[in-house]
Amino acid sequence: MPFHLNKVLLRKGRLEVLPTKSKICILGLSRVGKSSLLSLLQGRDIAEEADPTVGLEIEDSVLNGRKTSIWDFGGQERYRFMWQDFLRGAGLTVVVCDSTEENIEKTKEIYGKFSRYLSSKIIAIANKQDLPGALSADQVQKKLGITTYGMSAIRLDLRGRIRRILEYEIDSNK
């Protein structure tokens, strides 16, 4: 079982981790709704046009009564070099796509590149299910080959759904 961490130190050019709590990593290409999913989970209002995440944002939450660090990775190509180091120690990795054919194919490439660094359980969120032409979660799952849940991160009525998904997947990771 992977260890869980909250803090990363850079010492003598090497990353060191301090184990303290559960860790969930959220990754995907830019503009797929990773930060919106995190805002939805945390109970914040969702901005219609959110600024892209720069590098990495880490927030704490409580899932299943346990403290959990949620790592929201910037999806721009210039930040992806950090992913392999920051994926270490995750108990759950959530791959987010925007449910379009083009994005799913690019997500599959990215996932393939970084999957060797993942020691955690991996799921996908097929976000933006509310948009015309969105592929269903089942279609996305067939293309990615990992358990996939449909979502629309801008729908406040789905706040409980993202929480239930993460809590279920964390518990089933034991």
Language-model segments: which ranges?
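Conserved G1/Walker A P-loop phosphate-binding module
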Residues: P2-E49, V62, T68
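Switch II (G3) loop of P-loop NTPases
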Residues: G65-R80
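Short glycine-/polar-rich loops that comprise or flank the Walker A/P-loop
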Residues: K21, R66, G89-L92, L118-I122, ...
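Conserved C-terminal guanine-recognition region of P-loop GTPase G domains, centered on the G4
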Residues: S99-G145
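Canonical P-loop GTPase G-domain recognition
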Residues: P132-K174
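Conserved beta-strand segments of the P-loop GTPase G domain that flank and frequently precede/overlap
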Residues: I70-W71, T93-D98, A124-N127, G150-M151
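Short, glycine/acidic-enriched loop or turn micro-motifs at the edges of active sites
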Residues: G75-Q76, E101, D130, R155
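Inter-motif core of Ras-like GTPase G domains
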Residues: Y79-E101, Y111-Y117
